[in-house]
Amino acid sequence: MSTEQFSEKYYGVVGMSGMSVRQGDTAIAHGSGDVPVLATPQVIALAERATIAALLESMEQGQTSVGIRVEFDHISAASIGAEVRAIATCTKVEN
């Protein structure tokens, strides 16, 4: 498969992942803060699960994907019991 065909196959695919925030998901539990809200490492893991969901159906046996950059903004805290979701869209393919 050419680089162009590879890019066309994955560009624009979308995946989603969701979770309910539990005690073990908090900044306190992860040692990344002192408030009982969703920890940043958990936010990144949620985003990675959305990325996997986006690419999984398009990948062939033996293929995988790795993240090379993470950029996000905290726009609101998520307390225990909150339902949160991540949506991933493939906007660039690098080989």
Where are these regions (language model features)?
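Catalytic strand-loop segment that frames the active site of acyl-thioester-processing enzymes
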Residues: 2-38
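HotDog/MaoC-like acyl-thioester-processing domains
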Residues: 12, 79-80, 87-95
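Residue-level recognition of well-ordered beta-strand positions that form the cores
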Residues: 18-20, 71-73, 87-89
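Short coil/turn motifs at secondary-structure junctions
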Residues: 24, 52, 91-95
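A short mixed-secondary-structure module that forms the rim of ligand-binding clefts
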Residues: 39-43
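Hydrophobic beta-strand-centered segment that forms part of the acyl-chain substrate-binding groove
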Residues: 51-85
